[in-house]
């Protein structure tokens, strides 16, 4: 069984079988992220602008395939903005469709709802589908989220982040018998959840958190902590003391 298989197997194990306080001790943060020690990002291939392009923009994009045995590189692409949508994700799709089909990245909703296309653009973690190309410099630099192993190119391995999210048990805990109708909240109780339940688990915040960089085996990170508070603040939840004990 590979290390990745072990990580995935750990994620799907029932939390009842793993004491929550020891959960992270069984899930250490990988330190080399699949990159050889001392490796530097090297200059990669340069792809010219299409013939006749009147509004080209330069994108420098991180490329890395851990299975290839090669070191990371930055490929340079000239994107014709007249033939491309306004968002960074549009540019990535344009490159994949028209220049280099091997470029790998996540995307799904294209509406800022799913969190799949989170990446680092010009030094800032953002969703590629909501970041305008015009907001980036030239060249625009595109990297995967930091502090995570790389599956390929702009695709980070989220296993550790998901395991930390699972640890806080992000569902309603009930001790009293279920009512015949739904569990009601007052408007004021419901309003306490505003700003928390909207989290789409893109992990931009956790990727950019220095405390998580150095202590990810013990510190849950901002995304998981926000979700923990979301359930602590929920008037319907009946396991607040247990949740607080888990977070100690």
Residues covered by each model-derived region:
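Short, contiguous acidic and Ser/Thr-rich linear segments
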Residues: 73-86
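Ferredoxin-type iron-sulfur electron-transfer modules in oxidoreductases and energy-metabolism complexes
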Residues: 85-101, 140-248
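Short, contiguous pre-domain boundary segments
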Residues: 38-41, 70-75
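Short structural boundary motif marking the start of a folded domain
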Residues: 53-59
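Short, Gly/Pro- and small/polar-rich lid/capping loops
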Residues: 3-48
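Short polar catalytic/cofactor-binding loops
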Residues: 61-67
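Local cysteine-cluster metal-coordination motifs and their immediate loop/turn environment
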Residues: 59, 70, 103-135, 194-214
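Beta-strand-dominated extracellular/periplasmic modules and repeats
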Residues: 58, 74-76, 97-100
């Amino acid at each position: 069984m590979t290390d990745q298989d072990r990580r995935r197997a750990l994620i799907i194990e029932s939390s009842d079988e793993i004491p929550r306080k020891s959960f992270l001790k069984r899930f250490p943060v990988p330190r080399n992220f699949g990159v050889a020690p001392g490796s530097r990002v090297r200059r990669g291939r340069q792809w010219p602008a299409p013939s006749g392009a009147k509004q080209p923009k330069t994108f420098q994009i991180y490329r890395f395939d851990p299975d290839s045995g090669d070191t990371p590189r930055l490929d340079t692409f000239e994107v014709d903005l007249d033939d491309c949508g306004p968002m960074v994700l549009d540019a990535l799709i344009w490159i994949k469709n028209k220049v280099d089909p091997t470029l790998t990245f996540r995307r799904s909703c294209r509406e800022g709802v799913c969190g799949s296309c989170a990446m680092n653009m010009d030094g800032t973690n953002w969703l590629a589908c909501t970041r305008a190309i015009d907001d980036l410099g030239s060249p625009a630099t595109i990297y995967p989220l930091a502090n995570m192993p790389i599956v390929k190119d702009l695709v980070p391995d989220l296993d550790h982040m998901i395991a930390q999210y699972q640890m806080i048990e992000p569902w309603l805990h009930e001790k009293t018998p279920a009512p015949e109708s739904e569990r009601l909240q007052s408007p004021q109780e419901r309003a306490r959840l505003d700003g928390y339940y909207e989290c789409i688990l893109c992990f931009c915040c956790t990727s950019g958190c220095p405390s998580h960089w150095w202590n990810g085996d013990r510190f849950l990170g901002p995304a998981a902590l926000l979700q923990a508070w979301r359930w602590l603040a929920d008037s319907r939840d009946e396991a607040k003391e247990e949740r607080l004990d888990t977070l100690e």
